[in-house]
Every structure is written in C-alpha cells, then in structure tokens.
C-alpha cells in the first residue's frame, strides 16, 4: 500500500513520510451539515483495530473512534507468536484438541474460514509465510510490522485512536449508546455512538 514498501534485505515494512491531507473529507461533510454515524470501538487490541478498520472501510462517511486503556494500541498483538505475530493456523483438526467428543468439534472447525482474514491482510499489503506446523506469520516475522500496517490504514481512513482512556459507563438509549470515560489526563468525557 501507499506509504509502505517491502524491503527484502531487512524484511521490514518502512513508513515513508507523506504529507497529510489538509482537509479531512469527514470534517468537510460535518461542516456542510451532513450527519454522519459515530462508531465507537472499545479496546485497541488486534480485534479492536481490525474492527475499526473494517468499519471505516464499510462506512467511509462514519466517524470511527477507538478508545484504548493502554498508552499505546496493540500491546498484546506485539507479543503474540513470540513477537512474530501468529496470524492464523492452517493445520487445525479435531485430533489436535483434547475433547471427549471429537466428532462434535468437526463442524465448528469446518466453519472456520482461514482464507478470509488472510485475504483481508493481503489486501492491506501484508505478505505472509506459513511454517511447517501450519502457523501463519507476516513475511518479516515481526509483529510490529502488522501493527504499523494497521495503524497506517487506520490513519488513511481517518480513524481516531485515543489512548489512555478508561471506560466508566456504557448506557444504551433509543438513539444509540453513550460511553463515559476518563482520559489519560484525568478528565471525564462522554461520546455517543449510533
């Protein structure tokens, strides 16, 4: 993708500095009085970041905001697979699991579609490799590259990732949800989501 290149000698994605757009299209729409839905994602781990990106891709006019408690998003993603980011496993079979009824496990494992997430990562520009045990890793074997790629695409889709936010309450009403949280600075804020 734009902003990243694969470097065979270092096996890393490198971010190129590119000037940001001076005008966010979402800001222009809001100024024009166009109401856009708000989507809040609570948690900036691997699933939260992927959900935020998928939401931004599916609803380009939506304002997508991620609230993360930690100072940086993707903390556990960086540790998965011993820092290599084990994305998937193609070698899943009932006999590999301890269960009293392996036959009951078969339909569940058959329902797992490993191709879709890998296709999604590939569309983002992530090359992968599969080891002899069927574990799928980024080609660079660096979890930090997966996080950098997600952060790059989140920025391109104008997704806000707010860190140091501790959610205090989540209330549902007819008009949506209200999330009250404390910022890293200790102030209380409320955001609404549709």
Residue ranges and their predicted role:
Residues 36-47:
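Beta1/beta-strand and adjacent pyrophosphate-binding region of the FAD-binding site
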Residues 56-79:
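Glycine-rich FAD pyrophosphate-binding loop
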Residues 186-194:
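Core beta-strand elements of the Rossmann-like FAD/NAD(P) dinucleotide-binding domain
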Residues 11-13, 20-21, 25-28:
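N-terminal amphipathic/hydrophobic targeting modules at extreme N-termini
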């Amino acid at each position: 993708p734009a902003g990243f290149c694969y470097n065979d000698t270092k096996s890393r994605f490198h971010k190129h500095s590119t000037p940001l757009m001076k005008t966010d299209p979402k800001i222009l729409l809001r100024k024009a009085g166009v109401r856009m839905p708000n989507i809040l994602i609570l948690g900036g781990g691997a699933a939260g970041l992927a959900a935020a990106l998928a939401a931004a891709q599916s609803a380009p006019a939506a304002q997508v905001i991620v609230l993360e408690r930690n100072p940086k998003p993707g903390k556990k993603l960086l540790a998965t697979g011993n820092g290599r980011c084990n994305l998937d496993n193609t070698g899943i079979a009932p006999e590999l699991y301890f269960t009293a009824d392996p036959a009951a496990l078969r339909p569940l494992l058959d329902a797992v579609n490993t191709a879709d997430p890998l296709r999604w990562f590939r569309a983002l520009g992530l090359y992968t490799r599969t080891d002899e045990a069927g574990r799928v890793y980024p080609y660079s074997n660096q979890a930090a590259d997966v996080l950098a790629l997600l952060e790059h695409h989140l920025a391109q889709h104008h997704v806000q990732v707010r860190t140091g936010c501790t959610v205090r309450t989540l209330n549902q009403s007819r008009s949506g949800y209200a999330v009250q949280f404390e910022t890293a600075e200790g102030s209380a804020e409320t955001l609404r989501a549709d």
